[in-house]
Design a protein with these regions (language model features):
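Leu/Val/Ala/Ile-rich N-terminal alpha-helices, chiefly Sec-type signal peptides and the beginnings
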Residues: 19-24, 28
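Conserved, mostly hydrophobic/aromatic
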Residues: 16, 31
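Catalytic beta/alpha-barrel core
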Residues: 4-8, 32-35, 56-63, 89-100, ...
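Hydrophobic, glycine-enriched assembly/anchoring segments
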Residues: 260, 267-312
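A broadly used, surface-exposed interaction patch
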Residues: 49-114
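Long, charge-rich C-terminal accessory regions
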Residues: 131-274
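A short acidic, amphipathic alpha-helical/loop segment
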Residues: 18-20, 42-49, 104-108, 131-133
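Terminal catalytic/cofactor-binding subdomain
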Residues: 2-3, 26-27, 41, 51
Length: 312
């Protein structure tokens, strides 16, 4: 099982939608979507399109970043999920951190289920030692997602006895794109082959984005395409960077400098293709710059599909 964590921004949801049929066919990927802004009809339609392909996501009830971080926002978000029938096809995820009102959220979940809404429930245990959670607070939990399975175990039964998805964030987030120039490729994950022997159900990560959250970005001196690929029993990470990084001018030119390196690398290694790589190759052949949001979308797609294939 692979559970990528995304902030549910436009291109992130697009990436999931584009891969939905592949996820449905493999039954190995369940994305966790954490809205950072109030959902709207477009968000609902995209989730509907994902469900129509046979795929399912976890929708976070209590986001930890963005416009919905305030403690009272979770109830309005949860009601939106119910009113728009999103939990008929998708599951619910609760983030366990110091801001989580577990007592109130567990009551809301019980009331929703009592009213006839049937949905799966997963608990994502954040790295926050101030959390106090009783193992019997939530009922009908499916999985724990945690960086260490001893964390949910410490809360007692029945929560502590459930299967755990092994979470981490191996992506090397740097303040500026230029800092990736000259950075050597490295191992992104060894867990794809070892999670079962370590006693876990699956793995979870923040893809080629990292845990950190920034509400927006501006012009950059360098364009970087973050690219993962499977090599033996590990998933490796490489950063393809532009060359003309002295000014912020010509982002399209910078993109093609980085893209040419990526295409050459894929061809030299004879890497298996996927929807993300196909998207990059199409842009290269047409010499089309779609904007950096689309570049991020294709990077995410490639990573999710690489992880899907790497999970044993």
């Amino acid at each position: 099982m692979y559970m990528p964590r995304l902030r549910a921004r436009q291109h992130e949801v697009f990436a999931v939608r584009n891969c939905a049929s592949s996820f449905a066919a493999s039954s190995r990927v369940t994305p966790i979507l954490e809205p950072v802004a109030a959902p709207n009809d477009l968000f609902t339609r995209r989730l509907g399109a994902i469900a129509e392909e046979g795929a399912s996501c976890d929708l976070v009830l209590n986001p930890s970043v963005g416009d919905l971080r305030s403690k009272g926002s979770w109830r309005e978000l949860g009601d939106y999920y119910l009113e728009n029938d999103l939990l008929e096809h998708h599951g619910l995820a609760v983030l366990s951190n110091a801001d989580a009102d577990h007592a109130a959220m567990s009551r809301w979940i019980s009331e929703a289920r009592g009213a006839g809404h049937q949905f799966t429930l997963d608990i994502v245990h954040e790295l926050d030692l101030s959390v106090t959670l009783q193992g019997a607070t939530y009922h009908g939990v499916r999985w724990n997602i945690a960086e260490d399975r001893t964390v949910p175990a410490s809360y007692g039964l029945p929560l502590g006895g459930l299967l755990v998805v092994w979470a981490n964030d191996p992506f090397p987030s740097l303040p500026r794109n230029r800092e990736y120039v000259g950075r050597e490729e490295g191992i992104f994950s060894t867990r794809v082959a070892g999670y079962k022997s370590a006693g876990y159900l699956g793995v979870s990560d923040f893809l080629t984005l990292g845990r950190g959250y920034q509400p927006g970005g501006g012009p950059a001196y360098a364009v970087v395409i973050h690219f993962t690929y499977e090599s033996g029993d590990v998933v490796r990470l490489k950063h393809f960077c532009s060359e003309s990084n002295e000014t912020q001018d010509d982002p399209a030119g910078k993109f093609f400098e980085a893209l040419e390196k990526l295409i050459d690398f894929v061809d030299e290694r004879s890497l298996p293709t996927n929807l993300g790589i196909d998207g990059f190759r199409d842009l290269y052949q047409r010499q089309h710059f779609p904007g950096l949001g689309k570049v991020k979308e294709l990077s995410i797609m490639n990573h999710m599909l690489v992880m899907q294939d790497a999970i044993i």
